[in-house]
């Protein structure tokens, strides 16, 4: 397992999580993305 890939992947999921959080706190975006915002 390549540690550098793991770090890059962690970084990407971190960014995704931030983007999802930002989207889900925006009613319009949350409404358009009910599958990720619950």
Swiss-Prot record:
Q: Which residues cross the membrane?
A: none
Keyword set includes Nucleus: no
Cross-referenced PROSITE patterns: ALPHA_CONOTOXIN
The organism's superkingdom is given as Eukaryota
Residue ranges of the propeptide: 1-21
What are its GO cellular component terms? extracellular region; host cell postsynaptic membrane
Q: Name one Pfam family in it.
A: Toxin_8
Name which cysteines form disulfide bonds: 23-29, 24-37
Please list the tissues where expression of this protein has been recorded. Expressed by the venom duct.
**Which keywords label this protein?**
Acetylcholine receptor inhibiting toxin, Amidation, Disulfide bond, Ion channel impairing toxin, Neurotoxin, Postsynaptic neurotoxin, Secreted, Toxin
According to the record, the residues making up region (Ser-Xaa-Pro motif, crucial for potent interaction with nAChR) are 25-27
- What subcellular locations does the record give? Secreted
The GO molecular function terms of this record are:
acetylcholine receptor inhibitor activity; ion channel regulator activity; toxin activity
Entry-annotated residues carrying Cysteine amide:
37
UniProt function note: Alpha-conotoxins act on postsynaptic membranes, they bind to the nicotinic acetylcholine receptors (nAChR) and thus inhibit them.
Q: What is known of its domains?
A: The cysteine framework is I (CC-C-C). Alpha4/7 pattern.
Stated family: Belongs to the conotoxin A superfamily.
**What is the designated name of this protein?**
Alpha-conotoxin-like Qc1.6
Source organism (scientific name): Conus quercinus
Its taxonomic placement starts with:
Eukaryota, Metazoa, Spiralia, Lophotrochozoa, Mollusca
């Amino acid at each position: 397992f390549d540690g550098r890939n793991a770090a890059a992947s962690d970084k990407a999921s971190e960014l995704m999580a931030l983007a999802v959080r930002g989207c889900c706190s925006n009613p319009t975006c949350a409404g358009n993305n009910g599958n990720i915002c619950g």
